[in-house]
Amino acid sequence: PTQLWRLLVNNAPVSLKAVLLGGAAIPVELTEQAREQGIRCWCGYGLTEFASTVCAKEADGKADVGSALPGREVRIVDDEVWLRAASMAQGYWRNGQLYPLVNAQGWFATRDRGIVHDGKLTLVGRMDNLFFSGGEGIQPEEVERLIVSHPHVLQAFIVPIEDEEFGHRPVAVVEYDAEAGSIDLAEWVKDKLARFQQPVRWLTLPAE
């Protein structure tokens, strides 16, 4: 999504007709701007181990990434996304030995947290990104998705900082568009996030 944002914001001449987006939350504003310039946007979920795309759909503003493509299977085990496919990497090559990717039934545990509803996969975040603040679990990706839904936010990252009282507290690092002006995101999220999810500091991502 970041590279497409920059193409559109800089008014760069493009001949794109369609683009597959992934790797981060996809703001509706981004796909709408792209559509106005004749670019169809698709969102997907994939891994290198599976020769990339596992699920895909045309972007429609909904949180899911679509259904499994032919030859791919998705299941949820203890909140974790497991995958199985007709074609995938044989394993990881380490120290002259091939280590298999999958369990005895052929399933690969991705360490991604997700849910499946009506056959469509929605990603919640990485299992190992979850942190706790005052005993409450915070999934950074969930907070990031909310922040990037603001029309003047290009991308956002939530990182935990250590805190003596709470254990950890969330901090937001945000990239704004050129028309952002003076936005008070701390005020904007007050009725959209639980108190424990609200960042205690807001930092601006430095320009490249």
Language-model features and meaning:
Residues L21, I158, L203-T204:
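Hydrophobic/anchoring residues in structured secondary elements
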Residues L7-K62, E73:
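Gly/Ser/Thr-rich phosphate-binding loop
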Residues A85, R113-Q198:
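AMP-binding/adenylate-forming catalytic core of the ANL superfamily
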Residues A194-E208:
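AMP-binding/adenylate-forming catalytic domain of the ANL superfamily
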Residues L21-A24, Y45, R84-A86, G134-E136:
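Glycine-rich beta-strand-to-loop/alpha-helix junction loops that act as flexible
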Residues V54-E58, V77, R84, E175:
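Short beta-strand-to-turn element immediately C-terminal to the catalytic PLP-Schiff-base lysine
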